[in-house]
């Protein structure tokens, strides 16, 4: 835990008592603050009270006695409208912040020179965060990883000299961190997402930009420039006098980090210098993972990891569950769990990464269906359709891709395995990349992915991928 001493002797309200909210309560109390815990969910209020915290309805508190409102990222700060607790705090002149802001303030008090790596982007931020932490640990660094990736930041060990905090940040978390100042900041990409919470793509992009804009002098701001919004962010941050390390996996750069033929290069005034290779690394397959790997490589090199350690770390990276996770191999057939692909754009990244595909798709359909994936249809040997989207996807595939309506994973997995084995293709892939939400049959994509893994490992003669 990171005790938060910057509010010692003051009263702090915490609204939203999920994992990060309860961790904030504990950290503030440990640092000497008086905590008032609140939530719209009565069960969470009961849980907080049982944990020893004072609970209250913030409608009735004396805001003049409150030093700050710590808000969980899931509660609207601006769009579609500020939550009532936010409006009440703002009306009283009380600052509204999040748990990562508490971390930033404590770091400046305890160990201002301790490395702090912050990562954001519409896609790839979890993989990049996990990869950076893996590379640092493999190189012998004392490394703490948390934030949006799943572990509340205030549950980690405190900032200390020589200890690196690697933190994934969503746009919601950035919005709640006004003094964000990572020593290494990474913006991977910006595409349309979460517009219900930001109002427009322009506002969403501006929030993402703040992460790299906050990098202090002497730090490293890394920005992927393969989309227009991120490229604009790089220009704006550079105009403010910051040093920006641009990154591209799609085009040459005169200065920055580029990826070509599975090699990562540092380019200075047009001169290229190879820093790592990612060919043959199954967990980093695909152009999107090339961007993740290049950003991670640039980050750890900036922190002092040498190139030999970087290459060893890349080759030993196991990847993240449900993100092009290599579950097993049955003879020549590779089974890949990409359950995190809950829309067509995400599924495209997996479909672009393999050639002989036996595709398991479907679930609760998203707007737009799979029409945008037509360019990948020639790579799909057969599709196995599940869930509510099965009939809709069948209509799209009809006459273009052989398909079977399976309804469930329990039917789709053995049928796909049978057909892949009988195909006599070189390196066939049974790919779960649903292009759909999971909620028609599973509570979340993790449970869907876990079920796929169970079904695959229950098949005869399946071996782990090494």
Swiss-Prot record:
Spans through the membrane: none
Check the record and name the Gene3D superfamilies matching this protein.
Mur ligase, C-terminal domain, Mur-like, catalytic domain, NAD(P)-binding Rossmann-like Domain
Q: Which residues bind ATP per the record?
A: 121-127
Which example biological process does GO assign this protein?
Answer: cell wall organization
* GO molecular function terms noted in the UniProt entry: ATP binding; tetrahydrofolylpolyglutamate synthase activity; UDP-N-acetylmuramoylalanine-D-glutamate ligase activity
Q: What is its main location?
A: cytoplasm
Enzyme class, broadest EC rank = ligase
Catalysed reaction equations from the record: UDP-N-acetyl-alpha-D-muramoyl-L-alanine + D-glutamate + ATP = UDP-N-acetyl-alpha-D-muramoyl-L-alanyl-D-glutamate + ADP + phosphate + H(+)
Its GO CC terms? Answer: cytoplasm
Q: What PANTHER family does its record include? A: UDP-N-ACETYLMURAMOYLALANINE--D-GLUTAMATE LIGASE
What does this gene product do? Cell wall formation. Catalyzes the addition of glutamate to the nucleotide precursor UDP-N-acetylmuramoyl-L-alanine (UMA).
Q: What does the similarity note say?
A: Belongs to the MurCDEF family.
Name of the protein in its database record: UDP-N-acetylmuramoylalanine--D-glutamate ligase
> What is the originating organism of this protein?
Rhodopseudomonas palustris (strain BisB18)
Encoding gene (name): murD
């Amino acid at each position: 835990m990171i005790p938060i001493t910057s509010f010692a002797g003051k009263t702090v309200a915490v609204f939203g008592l999920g994992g990060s909210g309860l961790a904030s309560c504990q950290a503030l109390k440990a640092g000497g603050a008086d905590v008032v815990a609140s939530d719209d969910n009565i069960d969470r209020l009961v849980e907080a009270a049982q944990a020893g915290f004072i609970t209250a309805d913030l409608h009735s508190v004396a805001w003049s006695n409150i030093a700050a409102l710590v808000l969980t990222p899931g509660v609207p700060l601006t769009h579609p409208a500020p939550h009532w607790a936010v409006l009440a705090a703002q009306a009283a002149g009380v600052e509204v912040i999040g748990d990562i802001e508490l971390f930033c303030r404590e770091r400046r008090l305890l160990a201002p020179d301790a490395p702090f790596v912050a990562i954001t982007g519409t896609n790839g931020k979890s993989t990049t965060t996990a990869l950076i932490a893996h590379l640092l640990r493999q190189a012998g660094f004392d490394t703490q990883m948390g934030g949006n990736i799943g572990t509340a930041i205030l549950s980690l060990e405190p900032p200390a000299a020589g200890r690196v905090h690697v933190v994934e940040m969503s746009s919601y978390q950035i919005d709640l961190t006004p003094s964000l100042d990572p020593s290494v900041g990474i913006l991977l990409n910006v595409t349309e997402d979460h517009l219900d919470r930001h109002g427009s793509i322009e506002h969403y992009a501006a929030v993402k930009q703040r992460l790299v804009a906050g990098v202090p002098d002497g730090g490293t701001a890394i920005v992927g420039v393969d989309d227009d919004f991120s490229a604009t962010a790089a220009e704006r941050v550079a105009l403010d006098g910051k040093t920006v390390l641009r990154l591209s996996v799609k085009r040459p750069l005169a200065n920055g980090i580029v990826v070509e033929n599975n090699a990562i290069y540092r380019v200075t005034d047009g001169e290229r210098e190879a820093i790592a290779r990612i060919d043959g690394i199954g967990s980093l397959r695909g152009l999107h993972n090339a961007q993740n790997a290049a950003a991670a490589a640039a980050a750890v090199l900036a922190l002092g990891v040498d190139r030999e350690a970087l290459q060893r770390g890349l080759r030993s990276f196991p990847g993240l569950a449900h993100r092009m996770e290599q579950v097993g191999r049955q003879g020549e057939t590779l089974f890949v769990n990409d359950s995190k692909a809950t829309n067509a754009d995400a599924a495209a990244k997996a479909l672009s990464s393999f050639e002989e595909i036996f595709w398991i798709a479907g679930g609760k359909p998203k707007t737009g269906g799979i029409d945008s994936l037509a360019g990948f249809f020639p790579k799909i040997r057969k599709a196995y359709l599940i869930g509510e989207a099965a009939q809709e996807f069948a209509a799209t595939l009809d006459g273009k891709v052989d398909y079977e309506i399976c309804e469930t994973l329990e039917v789709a997995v053995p049928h796909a395995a049978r057909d892949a084995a009988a195909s006599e293709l070189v390196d066939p892939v049974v790919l779960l990349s649903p292009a759909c939400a999971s909620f028609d049959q599973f509570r979340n994509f993790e449970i869907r992915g876990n079920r796929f893994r169970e079904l695959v490992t229950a098949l005869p003669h399946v071996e782990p991928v090494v």
